[in-house]
Amino acid sequence: MTSGRTGILGGSFDPIHYGHLAIAEEVRVLLRLNRVLIIPAREQPLKPGGSVASPAHRLAMARLACADNPFFEVSRIEIDRPDPSYTSVTLQLLHEQGLNDLYLILGIDSVADLPRWREVRRILELAHIVGVARPGAAVDLSHLSQVLPQLPARLIEIDGPRLDISSTDLRQRVAQGRPIRYQTPDAVVAYIEANGLYR
């Protein structure tokens, strides 16, 4: 894996959709990143209930969705680990692979939740935090500087694109027999149909 300015976008991606891809591209362009790693989680510690589709299906959908963007790279670094997908561990592993200029892309609501994350101070040592705000949504982060005094120097806030798409909604639409085309790439739609996912 080559070094350089690298964005990290993790998530369940259950399924991946244009909202995820648009955020990754927006951050890549604005911050002049060399690439963005899309990292499907095996199991997210702060999201009880787990994913609906298997790790293998979610990885395959992410690869299909990112196939036409040379700046996106899908990583199986969390899928291959048996333990929960702790961000601090993932960043440490990437650091050990020679990636020293990391930009962790999070929704601004997740930034507000950082004090609950495992080894959050180590996360801030290993990566810049890119907080992506939903247009029109205000989240107060002023309290975080008291709990995490190093955060303001590591935080980059940007406004995200206006795309109101959620994986939960896509799963519900599939279950109801409603279309999801134009909300996720056609290759992902075809994969979901071919594998009978979310029915």
UniProtKB/Swiss-Prot annotation:
Keyword Nucleotide-binding carried by entry: yes
Catalytic activity, reaction form: nicotinate beta-D-ribonucleotide + ATP + H(+) = deamido-NAD(+) + diphosphate
Family matches, as InterPro entries: Cyt_trans-like, NadD/NMNAT, Rossmann-like_a/b/a_fold
CDD domains referenced in this protein's UniProt entry, alphabetically: NMNAT (cd02165)
Keywords assigned by UniProt, alphabetized: ATP-binding, NAD, Nucleotide-binding, Nucleotidyltransferase, Pyridine nucleotide biosynthesis, Transferase
Pfam families assigned to the protein according to its UniProt record, in alphabetical order: CTP_transf_like (PF01467)
Cysteine disulfide links: none
HAMAP family: NaMN_adenylyltr
Protein's organism: Roseiflexus castenholzii (strain DSM 13941 / HLO8)
Pathway: Cofactor biosynthesis; NAD(+) biosynthesis; deamido-NAD(+) from nicotinate D-ribonucleotide: step 1/1
EC number of the protein: 2.7.7.18
Protein name stated in the entry: Probable nicotinate-nucleotide adenylyltransferase
Gene: nadD
GO biological process terms on file: NAD biosynthetic process
Function: Catalyzes the reversible adenylation of nicotinate mononucleotide (NaMN) to nicotinic acid adenine dinucleotide (NaAD).
